[in-house]
Amino acid sequence: MAKKEKILGIDLGTSNSAAAVLIGGKPTIIPSAEGASQYGKSFPSCVAFTEDGQMLVGEPARRQAVTNPENTITAIKRSMGTDRKVKVHGKEYTPQEISAFILQKIKKDAEAFLGEEIKKAVITVPAYFDDNQRTATKDAGTIAGLDVVRLVNEPTAASLAYGLDKEDEDMVIMVFDLGGGTLDVTIMEFGGGVFEVRSTSGDTQLGGTDMDNAIMNYLAEEFKMETGIDLMEDDQAVQRLREAAEKAKIELSTTLTTEVNLPYITVAQDGPKHLIKTITRAKLEELVDPIVQKCAGPMEQALRDAGMTREDVDKIILVGGPTRMPIVQKFVEDFIGKPVERGIDPMECVAMGAAIQGGVLAGEIKDLVLLDVTPLSLGIETLGGVFTKLIERNTTIPTRKSQIFSTAADNQTSVDIHVLQGERPMAADNTSLGRFQLVGIPPAPRGVPQIEVTFDIDANGILNVSAKDLGTGKEQAITITAPNKLSEEEIKQKIEEAKKHAEEDRRKQEEIEIRNNADSMIYTAEKTLDELGDKVPAEKKEEVEKQVRELRELIAGDDIQAIKSKTEELTKTVQEIGVSYIPAGSTATSSTAAGR
């Protein structure tokens, strides 16, 4: 039987990212190549470019952020679906490209872990991501060399991870997903192997990053009161503050007090200044309470849209790093009146759920059905600037809806179709997704032509819209995408750039290794001569010293192959010395060098 192709499940997060894959029918988290950190097996969604042009992703990027803040990019997810560009070393990058670098790392780590090539992925997105943001996420996957077979809402993925071993229980689940940049609250019903999303609500600009900022601002204000110096004007100081704020937030989830200690945070006329501040959990909770209170609105809205009350909720699932904070857990428990489930890792369950959905699509998991919903209503602008809905929010997807419209003026031969997303009654108050024209309508009195407008949402939540004149059969259709969506040609170009970038990275890594080997060999050669002293004949010693000088000169240049060749030559000479002048059984350095 042919081996089934693995589909990678990816949680592409604002602050951290993770991936999982089905092994033996169970989701397994892919470990980051750098090993576990304070984030567990996930890694920071961080990309950096060093002065010599090397790209770093994940923990290595985060570690150097203090010394290189202007070339370190974090929280790019908040810019997905926008026309924002990030400029680094004179080159502009779209949010899709930066996200693709993160996805490339995930792909590479997964391939190293599994020992096989990964081509397909399921990527999770916040339930409240609009069409533009979803399309941008798919583009990022394509640039990274992945076939994104499905986009899944993050809360839905978390519920998949939770329900895998409980397929005989009927229940109502509330998924409270508070990540680095977004809050999603989802009400789901589960029974008979079917997950059905009843409603979703949230805030795309509310998350753990806001908490970090609150702590950071507090530290900066306290320091300014004590010293008169505004640290927020110093990029490096801000980066150190941001890291310290996040670290304090994480530590205070399990301890009652922590010390922020940032020596040499800045330099004043009277010398260097240090920031040393003790923060208690009580102080942290005072700082973040206004942010936590904002979580009530989406919970109320989700229950209202599902036609349910707090008493109807059977289980509460927490997702996202900030939900580890006691203040967040207590707030949710008090709001619903039930304890939260504690058997799930909030940092890993989304990736695990994505892997399960990948298993469903690959045919590895049977009898599990996922019915997702569209988070916002979709429709068109009609006469008078009114927003006419064709698909109501929280409609199960995939779905297709049609409605008949007509002309607004006599002898009108074309109509403009303005597609919108939102909940406001007037078109101008909602998000514009795109426009197109249907032309060639035969002249007729207003209201006579019949124009059928059809909205078709696929399983990824991506929208196709068509308009058809029923009298002539003429039809115009478009796939709604962001105004800044990359064209197929641009995506191809970005893929090639990504491949080129990967090759450059490999070359740079090889160059670094060759230079390091050369330095190491010089050290070994000099130490060997020093240890053996007069045992080495003068002409042999001169030969080694000459090769060392030549290798040092080459290291100062750019001819990598010459460095490699000269290193091999020096290695051979030192090995000959080892064979000729070191007694058997000796542990002199040259015997070690020969084994390098």
From Swiss-Prot:
Keywords: ATP-binding, Chaperone, Nucleotide-binding
SUPFAM superfamilies linked to this entry: Actin-like ATPase domain (SSF53067), Heat shock protein 70kD (HSP70), C-terminal subdomain (SSF100934), Heat shock protein 70kD (HSP70), peptide-binding domain (SSF100920)
Superkingdom of this protein's organism: Archaea
A GO molecular function held by the record: unfolded protein binding
Function: Acts as a chaperone.
NCBIfam families: PRK00290.1, prok_dnaK
Similarity annotation: Belongs to the heat shock protein 70 family.
Name under which the protein is recorded: Chaperone protein DnaK
Taxonomic source organism: Methanothermobacter thermautotrophicus (strain ATCC 29096 / DSM 1053 / JCM 10044 / NBRC 100330 / Delta H)
Recorded name of the encoding gene: dnaK
